[in-house]
Amino acid sequence: MPCLYICGECGAEHEIKPKEPVKCKDCTHRIMYKKRTDKMIQFEAR
């Protein structure tokens, strides 16, 4: 299942699949940030 990541250098969005190197396809920068979900997530407290 691919996830959306945002490049720390140029800000481009890329899908990174499992076993694929974690780097930007535009500028080859290696720091990528995972995009946050728009859905509301609720956790159960115990």
UniProtKB/Swiss-Prot annotation:
SUPFAM superfamilies: RNA polymerase subunits (SSF63393). GO terms for biological process: transcription by RNA polymerase I; transcription by RNA polymerase II; transcription by RNA polymerase III. Keywords: DNA-directed RNA polymerase, Metal-binding, Nucleus, Transcription, Zinc, Zinc-finger. A zinc finger (C4-type) spans 7-27. It is found in: Nucleus. Its main location: nucleus. InterPro entries: RNAP_P/RPABC4, RPABC4, RPABC4/Spt4. The keyword Iron does not apply. DNA-dependent RNA polymerase catalyzes the transcription of DNA into RNA using the four ribonucleoside triphosphates as substrates. Common component of RNA polymerases I, II and III which synthesize ribosomal RNA precursors, mRNA precursors and many functional non-coding RNAs, and a small RNAs, such as 5S rRNA and tRNAs, respectively. PANTHER family: DNA-DIRECTED RNA POLYMERASES I, II, AND III (PTHR12056), GEO11084P1 (PTHR12056:SF2). This is DNA-directed RNA polymerases I, II, and III subunit rpabc4.
